[in-house]
């Protein structure tokens, strides 16, 4: 499977270089060779592939910024700084969502174009090198997108896990007690940090700690907003992940077809060798039969001819 993908990407690079060379060298009234015609058919496909790659690169950059923002947020305590950071994070996530939807639309359009090429183009029938190249590249793009999905999912899980640890530390700082899991879950799920922590502070006779409580509330709002956006992004990726598996199965089928074709060719070569051996054997027995026939003729005709001469 990996070899097939590697060969397909090599074909992509080679075909694209050849296509650009043909386009630069070709002019009015100049007929391009057959390979150039094939590359011309792939020109739009290559351009679409590059556009998807650029969108993915932008998403990777946004992911790096989100990871950096998550680390930066650990050292921030002022509400204004936390809100500013939350604004940057939300802007990046909104941009990623927009790009992810655009990528999904582009990949769906590529799927439709691939299907149309199989129906309408004789050189792009199912299983042909051109069709395998288009299918493999489209599936490879989805595989990259799936890897990005896993990275964003890991970020979401890390943000919520770190937020949970922050709530636990702040609760311990205020009350001097390690909170039970149920208390932490209530603070996280219901967003009742101010009410719960104020009650805990009053119970233990500690002073006003509204700044800390407000910080936890701000972190809760930020974590919830980020989680909601990342879940929405995850759903977009998840919709495409189903197609990734389908494309993977198609590539496995293509690889099996290629292996089957190789087996058929090898089997055909064996049959040809057997046919040649059978032909040589038939000729040998034919020669032996002719020799035996000649000997029989000599053994029968010569005595008869001799007896006629004597009589």
Curated annotation (Swiss-Prot):
<feature type="topological domain" description="Cytoplasmic">
    <location>
        <begin position="1"/>
        <end position="284"/>
    </location>
</feature>
<keyword id="KW-1003">Cell membrane</keyword>
<keyword id="KW-1133">Transmembrane helix</keyword>
<dbReference type="InterPro" id="IPR045242">
    <property type="entry name" value="Syntaxin"/>
</dbReference>
<dbReference type="GO" id="GO:0006906">
    <property type="term" value="P:vesicle fusion"/>
</dbReference>
<dbReference type="GO" id="GO:0009504">
    <property type="term" value="C:cell plate"/>
</dbReference>
<dbReference type="GO" id="GO:0012505">
    <property type="term" value="C:endomembrane system"/>
</dbReference>
<dbReference type="InterPro" id="IPR006011">
    <property type="entry name" value="Syntaxin_N"/>
</dbReference>
<feature type="domain" description="t-SNARE coiled-coil homology">
    <location>
        <begin position="213"/>
        <end position="275"/>
    </location>
</feature>
<dbReference type="Pfam" id="PF05739">
    <property type="entry name" value="SNARE"/>
</dbReference>
<dbReference type="InterPro" id="IPR006012">
    <property type="entry name" value="Syntaxin/epimorphin_CS"/>
</dbReference>
<protein>
    <recommendedName>
        <fullName>Syntaxin-111</fullName>
    </recommendedName>
</protein>
<keyword id="KW-0812">Transmembrane</keyword>
<keyword id="KW-0472">Membrane</keyword>
<dbReference type="GO" id="GO:0031201">
    <property type="term" value="C:SNARE complex"/>
</dbReference>
<comment type="function">
    <text>Vesicle trafficking protein that functions in the secretory pathway.</text>
</comment>
<dbReference type="InterPro" id="IPR010989">
    <property type="entry name" value="SNARE"/>
</dbReference>
<dbReference type="GO" id="GO:0005484">
    <property type="term" value="F:SNAP receptor activity"/>
</dbReference>
<keyword id="KW-0653">Protein transport</keyword>
<feature type="topological domain" description="Vesicular">
    <location>
        <begin position="306"/>
        <end position="311"/>
    </location>
</feature>
<dbReference type="InterPro" id="IPR000727">
    <property type="entry name" value="T_SNARE_dom"/>
</dbReference>
<dbReference type="GO" id="GO:0006887">
    <property type="term" value="P:exocytosis"/>
</dbReference>
<feature type="transmembrane region" description="Helical; Anchor for type IV membrane protein">
    <location>
        <begin position="285"/>
        <end position="305"/>
    </location>
</feature>
<comment type="similarity">
    <text>Belongs to the syntaxin family.</text>
</comment>
<keyword id="KW-0963">Cytoplasm</keyword>
<dbReference type="GO" id="GO:0005886">
    <property type="term" value="C:plasma membrane"/>
</dbReference>
<keyword id="KW-0813">Transport</keyword>
<dbReference type="GO" id="GO:0048278">
    <property type="term" value="P:vesicle docking"/>
</dbReference>
<dbReference type="GO" id="GO:0009524">
    <property type="term" value="C:phragmoplast"/>
</dbReference>
<dbReference type="GO" id="GO:0006886">
    <property type="term" value="P:intracellular protein transport"/>
</dbReference>
<dbReference type="Pfam" id="PF00804">
    <property type="entry name" value="Syntaxin"/>
</dbReference>
<dbReference type="GO" id="GO:0000149">
    <property type="term" value="F:SNARE binding"/>
</dbReference>
């Amino acid at each position: 499977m990996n070899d097939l993908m590697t060969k397909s990407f090599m074909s992509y690079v080679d075909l694209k270089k050849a296509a650009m060379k043909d386009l630069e060298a070709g002019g009015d009234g100049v007929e391009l060779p057959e390979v150039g015609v094939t590359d011309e058919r792939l020109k739009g496909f290559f351009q679409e592939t590059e556009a998807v790659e650029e969108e993915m690169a932008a998403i990777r950059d946004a992911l790096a910024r989100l990871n950096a923002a998550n680390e930066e947020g650990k050292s921030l305590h002022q509400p204004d700084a936390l809100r500013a950071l939350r604004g940057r994070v939300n802007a990046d996530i909104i941009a990623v969502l927009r790009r992810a939807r655009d990528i999904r639309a582009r990949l769906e359009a590529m799927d439709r174009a691939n299907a149309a090429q199989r129906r309408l183009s004789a050189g792009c029938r199912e299983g042909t090198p051109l069709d395998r190249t288009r299918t493999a590249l489209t599936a490879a793009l989805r595989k990259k997108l799936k890897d990005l999905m896993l990275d964003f999912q890991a970020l979401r899980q890390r943000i919520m896990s770190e937020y949970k640890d922050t709530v636990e530390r702040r609760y311990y700082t205020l009350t001097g007690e390690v909170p039970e899991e149920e208390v932490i879950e209530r603070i996280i799920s219901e967003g009742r940090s101010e009410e719960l922590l104020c009650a805990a502070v009053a119970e233990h006779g500690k002073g006003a700690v509204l700044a800390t409580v407000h910080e936890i509330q701000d972190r809760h709002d930020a974590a919830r907003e980020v989680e909601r956006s990342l879940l929405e992004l995850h759903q977009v990726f998840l919709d495409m992940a189903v197609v990734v598996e389908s494309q993977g199965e198609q590539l496995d089928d293509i690889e099996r077809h290629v292996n089957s074709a190789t087996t058929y060719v090898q089997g055909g070569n064996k049959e040809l060798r057997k046919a040649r051996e059978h032909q040589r054997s038939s000729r040998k027995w034919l020669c032996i039969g002719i020799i035996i026939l000649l000997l029989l003729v000599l053994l029968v005709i010569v005595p008869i001819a001799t007896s006629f001469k004597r009589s």
